[in-house]
Amino acid sequence: MNDSLPPYAELLQLRTEQGEDGQTLFVMPFHDDVVGRPGYLHGGAIAGLLEFAAYGELSLALRGRDLHPKPISVTVDYLLGGRDRDTYAAAVIERLGARIANVEAFAWQKDRATPIASARINFLLAAD
């Protein structure tokens, strides 16, 4: 990520890494600001991580185009409780149209094949 992170991304202490397949991964370390009940992540922190992963992936795909993604719907499915360890997220663009983009994001901890949450986010691609 860069030095001009939105305040919520800074609060979550998000950082990026390159995955083995070259995909950008978003990483959220476990810390006091993301705790829900003791030993578990807060659902809002997980949703924020998923949204930043989706937005980041879409922003990379839109590089060089004068379009700015604006979320119009977000659906999060919580699959497992997020525990007290680093959480990773990545996103896949399912559809990139002229005006709308559909992105799916997944969050996991130990094993990418066992997600703790997923999100489907629809973006309006707005021109300046």
PLM segments and residue spans:
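A generic structural signal for short beta-strands and their flanking turns/coil linkers
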Residues: 10-12, 22-24, 68-74, 85, ...
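HotDog/MaoC-like acyl-thioester-processing domains
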Residues: 80-84, 88-128
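Non-catalytic linker/capping segments at the edges of enzyme domains
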Residues: 1-27, 31-33
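Hot-dog-fold acyl-thioester-processing enzymes
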Residues: 28-57
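Hydrophobic residues in beta-strands and at strand termini
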Residues: 28-30, 78, 125
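Hydrophobic beta-strand-centered segment that forms part of the acyl-chain substrate-binding groove
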Residues: 55-88, 93
